[in-house]
Amino acid sequence: MEIRAKSAGFCFGVQRAVDSVYKELEENSGEIYTFGPIIHNEQVVEDLNKRGIEVIDTVEQLKEIKEGTVVIRSHGVAKEIYDILEQQKLKMVDATCPFVKKIHNIVLDESNNGKTIIIIGNDNHPEVEGIKGWVVGEAIVIKDEEDIEKIDSFRNESICI
């Protein structure tokens, strides 16, 4: 068998997120949560669960937490989640991939400047949900060729894809 891959494993953003949760486990004796699974890897999520990390998936669950640490998943989350964490004075570890965080900043700036934001991806994927949550106003999500028609009504507007 010939092995062609020069490397294998997680990309740096995912590895950074996973490392941040394990580091938090070592340094923190309190309750630790992740907002959504830290990554799309059942073995990692299961191992973290066995070590006491609880995955929360909704704003309602987040609002019920009175103390502890919440780790933001590698895919990022909407700005609303950061606001709730701040309001509740919960410790936060932001494990959002730096590339994803850069997209959050771009859509925030561009939508604040009046541009219509168009996101290419699956509307229900956590990364897309997070990106949409940084848009001021509404974002258009294009999943496939059929969705391209959504753009037609914005032909004369300033857009950011």
Regions found by a protein language model. Name each.
Residues 1-160:
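The feature marks the mature, well-folded catalytic cores of soluble enzymes
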